[in-house]
Structures are given as structure tokens and as C-alpha cells.
Amino acid sequence: MIDAGVDDTVLEALASEHVLSLDAVLVTHWDKDHYGGLCNIAKRYSVGEVIVAQGAAQQAPSEIEDSGLNLVEVERGDTIHVGRFVCTVMWPCETVDGDDNEDSLVLLAQYVEGSAHFSMLLTGDSEVDQEHEYAPAVGDIDILKLGHHGSAKSVDMSLLEVLDPEVAIASAGARNSYGHPADECVAALQNYGARFYCTIDDGSVSFFPDARGIRVHCSGSRGTALE
């Protein structure tokens, strides 16, 4: 699991998916909305380890330190194998304290099973200044999880031309005070031609690769589509 939210919403999602335990939780950085629900999750589920960027373990918030959770650091180029997924750490490129958006742990997740395959870039709260640094090493992807909840600086046309995503998704709360996703972000995606999903309107969004493409299932009104 990547990030833990700030309240019990993630607990509800885990229960709906009939999750029994978690081998690992990856925390992209130490913003409260990315780790705040972790301790409650650990009270309900067995959590094997908490994965953070190199240097971030030493700066863990006190409630994480006191929880007894096993923190494991990873660095750029490390790989994490989850079933048929191979997740490669693309950022940060140096030791960080994990406190800032630009410290966000970024993963390229790749899945292959026979003729079914897809790649997805998971960006935490990173924005275009960081994304332009690691995007050339990523190359073409199928799915872009937008940085910083789809902020105005989460994406631009030159980044989209490098990554060439078919689908982009923003995770944002309804009526959030920041106005995420930003109009600039949505407009860039529309102009590029990438299909856009947001949890505000589409609810939980799931991706299922098969030989024909990627099926996208939303718990909201859009239902299921083939990309």
C-alpha cells in the first residue's frame, strides 16, 4: 500500500477489499495527509514494514517512532517486487529528510503477465520541477498518478510529451480548501488527450490490464471503461 491518508478512509477501503494484512506500507513523505492514518492501520492490520526514502527514517514523526513499526529506507534504482509488479524507485536521487513535497518517494510500477501489461508512475506530492528530472528515465507510461493531488504545478505539456500517458488520475478530497485538482492541470491533460479521472467525481479507481488494453473501473458514475 502507498500512503495512509489522514483519517479512517483508508481503513474502510482496506475492509472493502477484504485485506487481511499488509506486507508493507510505503510512505512517500512525512506530510500528515500521507502518513496520518498509519498508526490506526497498524492497530487493525499486521504491517510487515514501512518503506521510506533514504534519510527519511531518521526524521519520522514521533507517533511513527513510538509505534514500533519497522522502517526500511530505499534509494533511487532499488526495486520492490509485489506479485507480478516490479516497482522501481525513481526519486529522490539523494538523501532527504522526507519533510517536503520535493522529497516524495516516486515509483515506476510495471506489470507483465503474458500479453497483459501496463506501467504506472506514482508521484507522491512531487511537482514539475522534480518530475522533469526523473521523467526521461521513466519514458512512456500508460497511467500517471498526478503529483500533489493534481495541483497547478503537477503537470505541464512538456512533461506529458515525455511520459505520454493514456490515463491520468488525481487523488483529492471533495471540497478541499486547495481547489485540487487545479484547472491548469485538467486543461493540460485535456489538451494533450489523456483521459482524466479524479476520486472526487469517480470514487475509487481501479485498473485491470488485459490483452485488449486497460480496463478502468470507478465506483462512481463512470463505471467501467476500456482504455
What are these regions (language model features)?
Residues 1-227:
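Non-globular, low-confidence helical/coil segments that flank catalytic cores
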